[in-house]
């Protein structure tokens, strides 16, 4: 089970400060997780300018120009945000017994280490 999943709220914990034009301290929602590259794409963080060539799409319209998109950031540079205190926290796992239709099942649950709340 992964520590960070799509849709989680994370905070950038390394890099240049916002005063110097960096992204450290910014919070955003995880748009996608690239497991094989150990990277995540975070909404509103790590923008790059991408030059797109003018070409035809399936609908026949021509698009192109310069656009800004979020680039992946290494998973070790972000921390999950505690839903209670809105501050970065570590992720823990605990096993719980869940009974469904008379069958007992063991399930791993993610929780915030600072507050102990389930994620």
From Swiss-Prot:
GO MF annotations in UniProt: rRNA binding; structural constituent of ribosome
Family membership noted in the UniProt record: Belongs to the universal ribosomal protein uL24 family.
Subunit annotation: Part of the 50S ribosomal subunit.
GO cellular component: ribonucleoprotein complex; ribosome
Role: One of two assembly initiator proteins, it binds directly to the 5'-end of the 23S rRNA, where it nucleates assembly of the 50S subunit.
Keyword Secreted carried by entry: no
Top-level taxon of origin: Bacteria
This protein's record includes keyword rRNA-binding: yes
Keyword set, alphabetical order: Ribonucleoprotein, Ribosomal protein, RNA-binding, rRNA-binding
UniProt cross-references to PANTHER family, sorted A to Z: MITOCHONDRIAL RIBOSOMAL PROTEIN L24
Gene Ontology biological-process entries: translation
Gene name of the record: rplX
Name of the protein in its database record: Large ribosomal subunit protein uL24
CDD domains: KOW_RPL26
């Amino acid at each position: 089970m992964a520590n960070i999943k799509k849709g989680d709220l994370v905070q950038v914990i390394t890099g240049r400060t916002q005063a110097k034009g960096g992204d450290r301290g910014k919070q955003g929602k995880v748009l996608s997780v690239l497991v094989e590259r150990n990277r995540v794409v975070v909404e509103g963080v790590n923008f790059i300018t991408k030059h797109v060539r003018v070409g035809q799409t399936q609908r026949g319209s021509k698009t192109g120009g310069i656009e800004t998109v979020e680039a992946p950031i290494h998973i070790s540079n972000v921390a999950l945000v505690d839903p209670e205190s809105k501050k970065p926290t570590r992720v823990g796992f605990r096993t719980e017994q869940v009974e469904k239709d008379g069958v007992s099942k063991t399930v791993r649950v993610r929780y915030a280490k600072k507050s102990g709340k389930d994620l």
